[in-house]
């Protein structure tokens, strides 16, 4: 297989004289270079990845006033009947733009995908949740607009309705979605403004594995866009929140016994400036919060939050507080104290993660953490979990610098100007459950 050099790697979004500019750090696979042991204690020789090549300011003049960048993953074919669709990059700026994931060329401006006229009062998007079956965007007025796709293998088939979702209901947040299987993945989460409650937006859409037809069959999409209330005992933890708020919430889906349920991890902040980590999963079309777990982060009280990176297979997050990096686990049934793993001289601007997951026969790969600092420098670290107990709790954590390195420094300095955001671009949704070195 010939892979585009931009299909996977680290994306750095910079503000260059007010304009959105992308840089790209490429992956290089090193074959048979390291020896380790797998989970059965057997010695294995395995491949590794390195970051030697960087293309700085590769894509210029995308637009003005950059705010962030995220990845829109395409349809991951399981059995090969429908072709796997890779990804797009969406640059959040004054005029949002969507880029081809393999070439980084512009595909469309987001606003051009509306039926007819733009919404009354204009369209200024601030957040989005995009999957291969539907796209949802929240604007600065708190309205969410929905784009339903008729087929699984086209990012731009269909269009946004110019009438806001659910009779002009206002939302104060819209959270990322991760959909890489037809089953058990039918939800986008949003925060309803009037009562500060987390709700579900249906995100249906499935294709027949026995056919090469990419069209979604009707009974899987008829409820897309419907607002559903959480149910069950643990729903109260996200309803009518008065003494706390959701600082951020990110996808945390993991393959548990093959069930592939959607999952999220939320960083909560109390009115007293305390923090708490909450994790939960959701069963398809059963709106109970499942496997709910919370962990108080006492060490982080009164600190200034910057960003959070999730390592979903390994079930921990790294949280940036000012110039500090904190490692926090979410192991069900176990209290885990945050661990300070690094302090920089400069403030952290943004984080992203590459949580490499392969089958156990290859041994465990360390997660990789991308860190951007306010001085324009960018680093990639391996997160080394040491002294792990049978319960899953880790006693010691270190980080090891992977980038910049001796090879990459031959191509220039490690300064990307005014960094706005960073992202590990996975390229293909199948990589979530089985990383391809």
Give the label of every model feature segment.
Residues 62-69, 233-246, 297-305, 345-358, ...:
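Repeat-based blade/solenoid architectures
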Residues 301-379:
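Loop/turn-rich, solvent-exposed surfaces of beta-rich toroidal or solenoidal domains
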Residues 14-75, 79-113:
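Beta-propeller domains
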Residues 26-30, 101-104, 150, 204, ...:
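Short loop/turn segments that connect beta-strands within beta-propeller blades
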Residues 10, 88-89, 135, 317, ...:
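Hydrophobic beta-strand positions that form the internal "hydrophobic ladder"
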Residues 1-6:
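Beta-strand-enriched, solvent-exposed domains that form extended recognition/catalytic surfaces
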Residues 108-324, 329:
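Acidic, serine/threonine- and glycine-rich low-complexity intrinsically disordered segments
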């Amino acid at each position: 297989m010939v892979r585009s050099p931009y299909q996977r790697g680290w994306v750095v979004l910079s503000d260059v004289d007010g304009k959105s500019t992308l840089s790209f750090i490429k992956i290089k696979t090193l074959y048979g270079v390291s020896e380790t042991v797998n989970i059965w204690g057997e010695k294995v020789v395995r491949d590794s990845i390195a970051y030697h090549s960087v293309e700085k300011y590769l894509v210029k003049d995308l637009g003005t006033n950059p705010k962030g960048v995220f990845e829109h993953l395409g349809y991951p074919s399981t059995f090969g009947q429908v072709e796997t669709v890779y990804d797009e990059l969406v640059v959040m700026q004054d005029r949002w733009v969507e880029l081809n994931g393999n070439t980084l060329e512009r595909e469309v401006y987001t606003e051009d995908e509306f039926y007819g006229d733009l919404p009354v009062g204009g369209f200024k998007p601030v957040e989005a949740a995009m999957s291969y079956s539907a796209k949802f965007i929240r604007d600065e007025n708190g309205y969410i607009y929905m784009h339903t796709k008729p087929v699984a293998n086209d990012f731009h088939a269909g269009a946004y309705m110019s009438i806001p979702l659910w009779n002009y209901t206002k939302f104060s947040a819209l959270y990322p979605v991760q959909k890489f299987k037809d089953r058990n993945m039918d939800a986008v989460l949003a925060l309803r403004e009037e009562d500060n409650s987390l709700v579900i937006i249906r995100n249906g859409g499935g294709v027949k594995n026995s056919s090469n037809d990419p069209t979604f069959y009707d009974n899987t999409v008829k409820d897309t866009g419907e607002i559903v209330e959480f149910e069950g005992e643990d729903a109260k933890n996200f309803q009518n929140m008065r003494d706390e708020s959701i600082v951020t919430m990110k996808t945390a889906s993991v393959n548990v016994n093959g069930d592939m349920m959607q999952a999220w991890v939320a960083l909560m902040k109390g009115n007293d400036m305390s923090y708490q980590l909450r994790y939960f999963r959701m069963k398809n079309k059963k709106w109970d919060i499942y496997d709910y777990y919370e962990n108080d982060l006492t060490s982080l009280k009164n600190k200034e939050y910057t960003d959070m990176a999730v390592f979903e297979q390994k079930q921990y997050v790294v949280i940036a507080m000012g110039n500090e990096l904190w490692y926090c686990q979410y192991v069900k049934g176990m209290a885990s104290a945050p661990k300070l793993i690094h302090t920089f001289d400069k403030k952290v601007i943004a984080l992203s993660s590459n949580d490499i997951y392969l089958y156990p026969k290859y041994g465990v790969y360390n997660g990789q953490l991308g860190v951007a600092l306010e001085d324009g420098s960018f680093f990639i670290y391996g997160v080394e979990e040491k002294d792990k107990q049978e319960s899953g709790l880790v006693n010691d954590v270190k980080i090891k610098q992977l980038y910049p390195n001796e090879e990459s420094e031959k191509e220039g300095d490690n300064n990307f100007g005014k960094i706005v955001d960073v992202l590990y671009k996975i390229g293909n949704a199948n990589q979530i459950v089985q990383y391809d070195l």
